[in-house]
């Protein structure tokens, strides 16, 4: 009883922080003519309510795709339609065709913020609570502390409740998928993940680990027996879920192709705005977007992404395990973020979710990563006038992690899960005994750099010739951190050893 009482308190704390952040500004507030993501979500409600399904993704006089045209999968459109019905009941002006463009009011802001909170309460928060309750080999207090830290992760809160999006829906479905598959409810887990992909196509960042883990399970059961039966069942679940979600768009071939064109807009280029990945960072020194043809950029990003995630995926197929699955989710999502085509700064949330799932296993490194992921979105958060909420939520999260996990005491090679790797290296370099000390120093350098860059960005004006100087520096520093983490997580995956300390797993 006490466990559920404390878990309820944790959820209430998470909800309080979320609602407090929601009282602040949002993307594009009072900034015509395009406004921002808040207006995009409102506009999708307008379009889905007033136009027939076959016109949702097509350009027309009633649906100007240049003005926040719908570019997410059908499940997002259905969610927008559901919200639109509620909006119509409260105030029809909020979704009136054409005349509602750029609509802003306190009442409408309250409505929009409430829709995010309800989605969070229905999908993401229950998944977090159940995940933490199912963790093995840790005390009840640690499970509750784990839930608190995950629910206080500032990146997701600031984007969903500040900037304004519904990332908790797709991430929540993905987490339900992780829960299902880790608990051997493979069909339910696959269904949940299919819903995640059909809500936001960026969930494809997680698709390969799901595929490889399930394929590994099938191989382990034997493809001539139970494994083959499981494979057929999984294929049926995936096909059926996609067919049901896409059914209204399968009536005509052009309908399906148009939706796909909207979901994967190759013509937008290698990257947009300032994002902390390889291509944006490297573009500072060599203008890749201007020098290389579009098709070469596509091939280059595909090959880089594929090669960077291949080792972890092969290992997961050959040795499927719950622990390996979670770490491969991190590695693959980070590879996609760093190397893939058309990445947005908010896509780092797709990496942050699986990092949250290993928070209790490697608290020091997970906390560090989650701090960097929030920092990497600083230019966007400043643009939305969310500096104060960013600072407060980041400090609250950091304090929660420090007090819950004593992260500064968890920096030994064993606690960092680098013991097997260090032993392997010491066979050739016996003096290699300082790895944990190096990581501690790197953490200090990283945190100091982030603090200094934040202060510089807020207090100093950039040179006139370099107006984006601080934004570029934030992205570059974040990218360096992410490259380090990519190496680190792949080391854990490739050097995973049974001789290491017992890992907390979901049964």
UniProtKB/Swiss-Prot annotation:
Identify the domain of life: Eukaryota
Q: What is its EC number?
A: 2.4.1.267
Pfam families associated with the record: Alg6_Alg8
Listed A to Z, the keywords are:
Congenital disorder of glycosylation, Disease variant, Endoplasmic reticulum, Glycoprotein, Glycosyltransferase, Membrane, Transferase, Transmembrane, Transmembrane helix
Which segments cross the bilayer?
Answer: 4-24, 115-135, 144-164, 173-193, 227-247, 298-318, 324-344, 362-382, 388-408, 438-458, 473-493
Biological processes per GO annotation: dolichol-linked oligosaccharide biosynthetic process; protein N-linked glycosylation
Q: Which residues are glycosylated?
A: 59
Chief localisation class:
endoplasmic reticulum
Which GO cellular component terms are attached? Answer: endoplasmic reticulum membrane; lumenal side of endoplasmic reticulum membrane; membrane
Keyword Transmembrane helix carried by entry: yes
For the Cytoplasmic compartment, the record's topological domain ranges are: 1-3, 136-143, 194-226, 319-323, 383-387, 459-472
Q: Which reaction does it catalyse?
A: an alpha-D-Man-(1->2)-alpha-D-Man-(1->2)-alpha-D-Man-(1->3)-[alpha-D-Man-(1->2)-alpha-D-Man-(1->3)-[alpha-D-Man-(1->2)-alpha-D-Man-(1->6)]-alpha-D-Man-(1->6)]-beta-D-Man-(1->4)-beta-D-GlcNAc-(1->4)-alpha-D-GlcNAc-diphospho-di-trans,poly-cis-dolichol + a di-trans,poly-cis-dolichyl beta-D-glucosyl phosphate = an alpha-D-Glc-(1->3)-alpha-D-Man-(1->2)-alpha-D-Man-(1->2)-alpha-D-Man-(1->3)-[alpha-D-Man-(1->2)-alpha-D-Man-(1->3)-[alpha-D-Man-(1->2)-alpha-D-Man-(1->6)]-alpha-D-Man-(1->6)]-beta-D-Man-(1->4)-beta-D-GlcNAc-(1->4)-alpha-D-GlcNAc-diphospho-di-trans,poly-cis-dolichol + a di-trans,poly-cis-dolichyl phosphate + H(+)
Question: Where is this protein found?
Answer: Endoplasmic reticulum membrane
Record topological domains on the Lumenal side: 25-114, 165-172, 248-297, 345-361, 409-437, 494-507
The similarity comment for this entry is: Belongs to the ALG6/ALG8 glucosyltransferase family.
Q: Which disease is it linked to?
A: Congenital disorder of glycosylation 1C: A form of congenital disorder of glycosylation, a multisystem disorder caused by a defect in glycoprotein biosynthesis and characterized by under-glycosylated serum glycoproteins. Congenital disorders of glycosylation result in a wide variety of clinical features, such as defects in the nervous system development, psychomotor retardation, dysmorphic features, hypotonia, coagulation disorders, and immunodeficiency.
What this protein is reported to do is described as: Dolichyl pyrophosphate Man9GlcNAc2 alpha-1,3-glucosyltransferase that operates in the biosynthetic pathway of dolichol-linked oligosaccharides, the glycan precursors employed in protein asparagine (N)-glycosylation. The assembly of dolichol-linked oligosaccharides begins on the cytosolic side of the endoplasmic reticulum membrane and finishes in its lumen. The sequential addition of sugars to dolichol pyrophosphate produces dolichol-linked oligosaccharides containing fourteen sugars, including two GlcNAcs, nine mannoses and three glucoses.
Name of the protein in its database record? Dolichyl pyrophosphate Man9GlcNAc2 alpha-1,3-glucosyltransferase
Instruction: Give the originating organism.
Output: Homo sapiens (Human)
């Amino acid at each position: 009883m006490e466990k559920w009482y404390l878990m309820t308190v944790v959820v209430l704390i998470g909800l309080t922080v979320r609602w407090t952040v929601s009282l602040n500004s949002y993307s594009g507030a009072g900034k015509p003519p395009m406004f921002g993501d808040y207006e995009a979500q409102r506009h999708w409600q307008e379009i889905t309510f007033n136009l027939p399904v076959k016109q949702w993704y097509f350009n027309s006089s009633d649906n100007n795709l240049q003005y926040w045209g719908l570019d997410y999968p059908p499940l997002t459109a259905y969610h927008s339609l559901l919200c639109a019905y509620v909006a119509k009941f409260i105030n029809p002006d909020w979704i009136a065709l054409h005349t509602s463009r750029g609509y802003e009011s306190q009442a409408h802001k309250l409505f929009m913020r409430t829709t995010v909170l309800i989605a969070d309460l229905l999908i993401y928060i229950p998944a977090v609570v159940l995940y933490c309750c199912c963790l093995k080999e840790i005390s009840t207090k640690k499970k509750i502390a784990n839930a608190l830290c995950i629910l206080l992760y500032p990146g997701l809160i600031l984007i969903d409740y500040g900037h304004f999006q519904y990332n908790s829906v797709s991430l929540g479905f993905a987490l339900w998928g992780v829960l299902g598959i880790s608990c051997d409810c493979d069909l339910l887990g696959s269904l949940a993940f299919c819903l995640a992909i059909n809500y936001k196509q960026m969930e494809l960042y997680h698709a390969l680990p799901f595929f490889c883990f399930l394929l590994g399970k099938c191989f382990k059961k034997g493809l001539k027996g139970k494994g083959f039966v499981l494979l057929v069942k999984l294929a049926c679940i995936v096909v059926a879920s996609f067919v049901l979600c896409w059914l209204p768009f399968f009536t005509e071939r052009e309908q399906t192709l148009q939706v796909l064109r909207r979901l994967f807009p190759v013509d937008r280029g290698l990257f947009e705005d300032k994002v902390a990945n390889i291509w944006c960072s490297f573009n500072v020194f060599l203008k890749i977007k201007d020098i290389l043809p579009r098709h070469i950029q596509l091939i280059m990003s595909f090959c880089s992404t594929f090669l960077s995630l291949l080792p972890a995926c092969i290992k997961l197929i050959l040795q499927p395990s719950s622990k390996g699955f979670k770490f491969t989710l991190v590695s693959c999502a980070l590879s996609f973020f760093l190397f893939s085509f058309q990445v947005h700064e908010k896509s780092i949330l797709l990496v942050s979710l699986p990092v949250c799932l290993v928070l209790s296993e490697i608290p020091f490194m997970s906390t560090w990563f989650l701090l960097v992921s929030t920092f990497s979105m600083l230019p966007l958060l400043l643009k939305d006038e969310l500096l104060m909420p960013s600072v407060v939520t980041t400090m609250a999260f950091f304090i929660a992690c420090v007090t819950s996990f004593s992260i500064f005491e968890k920096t030994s090679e064993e606690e960092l899960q680098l013991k097997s790797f260090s032993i392997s290296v010491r066979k050739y370099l016996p003096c290699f005994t300082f790895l944990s000390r190096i990581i501690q120093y790197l953490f200090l350098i990283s945190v100091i750099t982030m603090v200094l860059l934040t202060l510089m960005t807020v207090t100093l004006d950039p040179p006139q010739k370099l107006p984006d100087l601080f934004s570029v520096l934030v992205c570059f520093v974040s990218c360096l951190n992410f490259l380090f983490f990519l190496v680190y997580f792949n080391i854990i995956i490739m050097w995973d050893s049974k001789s290491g300390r017992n890992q907390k797993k979901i049964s």
